[in-house]
A protein has these predicted regions:
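Short, contiguous, well-structured surface segments enriched in hydrophobic/aromatic residues
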Residues: 39, 59-60
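A short mixed-secondary-structure module that forms the rim of ligand-binding clefts
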Residues: 62-118
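Residue-level signal for inorganic ion chemistry
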Residues: 125
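Short, conserved beta-turn/loop elements at beta-strand boundaries and strand-helix junctions
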Residues: 130-134
């Protein structure tokens, strides 16, 4: 599915940054890959580093794609949601559902690295499942038949023994009747970043030089990565950014 890449005027700085990074790395097939982490956190996150946390257990991680970027309603385009597709049968989603039984939303940490522009985003997110049927149908219809089949399986008890060799054909035939309706296993997880650490790494310090002999190189002056912290202020409904180094 093609990302919504048009950025309206005066949008939030996080959305501007992440869309710019996605566009500049879109030639890479894995440019939309996102790592999401969930764990039981004992202490609140440190103000200047997303890594100084104490976990009560090993964090549960999942790698997925950013399928779309949307504006959160009633925030005047200042708060952004990252849409991800998941299968409800995965351990990751089952764990989140257990967590949400007595909570309104789940805190997740997401990270993405862009090799071409040498950038890294680490995001503290509020996360929730989208339950609006119209929205679910919209994204479900964006999938092709093969992608839809990944969210559906046929109970072996419902397949006759003499048809076992054609199980794949039976699956396609079975699912073709239901493919217009979203699978019960299809879920939309929306990540809403509220605190973002953006690191821009310098290009390699040693580069080839046309005036040097083979295997010789020119050493460039050492440069440090630039680190920025972006925070969403709910009361003011605006983002602010500070450079950390």
């Amino acid at each position: 599915m093609k990302l919504s890449i048009e950025t309206p005027p005066n949008t939030n700085i996080f959305k501007q940054g992440i869309i710019k990074s996605l566009n500049e790395n879109k030639q890479l097939i894995f440019s939309k890959k996102l790592t999401i982490c969930h764990s039981s956190i004992k202490n609140s996150i440190n103000n200047n580093s997303p890594l100084k946390e104490e976990y009560s257990e090993f964090p549960l991680m999942e790698i997925t794609d950013i399928k779309d970027i949307i504006d959160i309603p009633n925030t005047e385009g200042k708060l952004t949601g990252l849409i991800c597709f998941f299968d409800k049968r995965t351990l990751f989603i089952e764990t989140i559902n257990d967590y949400l039984k007595d909570k309104e939303y789940i805190p997740l940490t997401a990270s993405i690295y862009f090799p071409l522009t040498r950038e890294k985003y680490i995001m503290n997110c509020k996360s929730e499942f989208i339950k609006d049927e119209k929205i679910i149908n919209k994204y479900w219809s964006s999938l092709n038949e093969e992608e839809k089949l990944q969210y559906e399986t046929v109970d072996k008890d419902s397949i006759k023994p003499d048809n076992d060799k054609n199980e794949k054909d039976d699956l396609v035939k079975y699912f073709a009747q239901e493919q217009k309706l979203p699978s019960k296993n299809f879920s939309l997880l929306m990540l809403i970043p509220i605190k973002v650490w953006h690191t821009i790494f310098p290009m390699p310090q040693v580069i080839a030089h046309i005036n040097k002999k083979k295997f010789e190189s020119l050493l460039k002056p050492h440069k440090m990565p630039k680190k920025f912290l972006m925070n969403y202020d709910k009361e003011k409904n605006e983002w602010n950014s500070v450079q950390l180094n």
